[in-house]
Each structure stands twice: as structure tokens, then as C-alpha cells.
Regions:
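Extended compositionally biased segments used for macromolecular assembly or nucleic-acid engagement
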Residues: 1-35, 42
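DEDD superfamily 3′-5′ metal-dependent exonuclease/proofreading module
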Residues: 8-10, 34-37, 47, 51-54, ...
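Helix-hairpin-helix/helix-loop-helix acidic hairpins
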Residues: 28-82
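Intrinsically disordered or highly flexible coil/loop and linker segments, enriched in small
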Residues: 59, 161-168
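Long, well-ordered mid-to-C-terminal structural blocks that present hydrophobic/aromatic surfaces
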Residues: 65-97, 102-105
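Phosphate-backbone recognition surface of nucleic-acid-processing proteins
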Residues: 89-163
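Long, highly charged low-complexity segments enriched in Glu/Asp and Lys/Arg with interspersed Ser/Thr
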Residues: 166-182
Length: 182
């Protein structure tokens, strides 16, 4: 299974026999031992706790998304609510993020690697936390730096517009990025 949340739901809803039938594996061919009821209860309890954490995460993401709609809609549109919140956190405030050049926005979150580069001459970081953006994730490894530079540029523009309460240009910025790298 690819999705951890779905896996937890399957554990909560079905027993071992149902799961084996679903994936078309016989009881003899399956790995592992049969668990007694006393061992199954802690596993199910843990699965419930994990499920509750997933639900809490969704709730928090919804809250952050709503908050970002009001505070900085352009940054949210360009990079998503969670990444926008992390960038503002690393910068210290929306004001500080808006004052940063794109090159600094690009390596936010990679300060340790930057100082290692300055101290020892190691390779400089190409990106910080913006590596989590889908455009960078989908790009080939050798294009990560180029995509990160363009993305940081658009984020820096969006931050300036949001801080100085200009008009909404997030869609235009995102469209430019998708046209170039999408």
C-alpha cells in the first residue's frame, strides 16, 4: 500500500483473513505469525492513535490554509499553505520574508549547509525547505537548482505584494512557473 493513512484504515476495519483475501494471498503463503487477541489489541489501539493524528493534521492544515488566505494569499497560491507557513516561520515574519532577496528565500532552511559551504568549501546548497514544492519534487535532479531559483523568485515577489497589500497576482505567478517547468 502506498498511502499510510489508508493502511491504518485497513488495519482498523478488517481482520487478517479479509486483508489476505483482498490481496489474493493464501494463509499459508503469508508471512508472519498469527497474533493472539492480547497482541492484537495494542496494535489496534496504536492504529486508532495514528488515525487520530492524521485527522488532527488535516484539521491543522485546514486552519493554516484559512489563515494564509487572509494574511498572504499570493504566497499561498504560489507555494501552498504549509510551505508558505514554513517559509514565514524560517524568515521570522512576513515583513522579514518580504525584505529578503530571492537567493535568500531559496536557501531558507538550509543554513547549516550554507555555513558548512562557507567554512569548509563544501558544495553550496541549491535549495532549502522549498524542496518540498511539487515543481521541484517532479523535476529531474539536475534541474532542481534552476526550478528552485525560479520558484524562490516568484515567492519573493509574492511576499512583497502580500506585505505591502498589493493586488492578487498569485495565479499569474503560479501560471508562469507551471508554463516554464510544468
Amino acid at each position: 500500500m502506498q498511502d499510510h493513512e489508508k493502511f491504518v484504515m485497513e488495519i482498523l476495519k478488517k481482520d487478517k483473513d479479509e486483508l489476505l483475501k483482498e490481496i489474493k494471498v493464501s494463509h499459508e503463503d503469508s508471512m508472519g505469525a498469527d497474533l493472539g487477541q492480547e497482541n492484537l489489541e495494542p496494535i489496534k489501539s496504536l492504529a486508532h492513535q495514528i488515525y487520530d493524528l492524521y485527522q488532527l493534521r488535516k484539521l491543522q492544515e485546514g486552519y493554516i490554509s484559512t489563515l494564509m488566505d487572509g494574511l498572504c494569499p499570493n504566497i499561498k497560491t504560489v507555494c501552498g499553505a504549509l510551505l508558505a507557513a514554513k517559509l514565514i516561520e524560517h524568515a521570522g515574519s512576513l515583513k522579514r520574508l518580504s525584505e529578503m532577496p530571492a537567493s535568500t528565500v531559496q536557501i531558507l532552511g538550509a543554513e547549516k549547509a550554507l555555513f558548512r559551504h562557507m567554512r569548509t568549501g563544501a558544495k553550496p546548497p541549491r535549495h532549502g525547505i522549498i524542496i518540498n514544492h511539487p515543481l521541484i519534487s517532479k523535476a529531474p535532479e539536475k534541474m532542481h537548482g534552476k526550478v528552485a531559483r525560479s520558484l524562490a523568485d516568484k515567492i519573493a515577489i509574492a511576499a512583497k505584494v502580500d506585505y505591502f497589500q498589493g493586488k492578487f497576482i498569485g495565479d499569474k505567478l503560479k501560471e508562469e512557473l507551471e508554463k516554464k517547468f510544468g
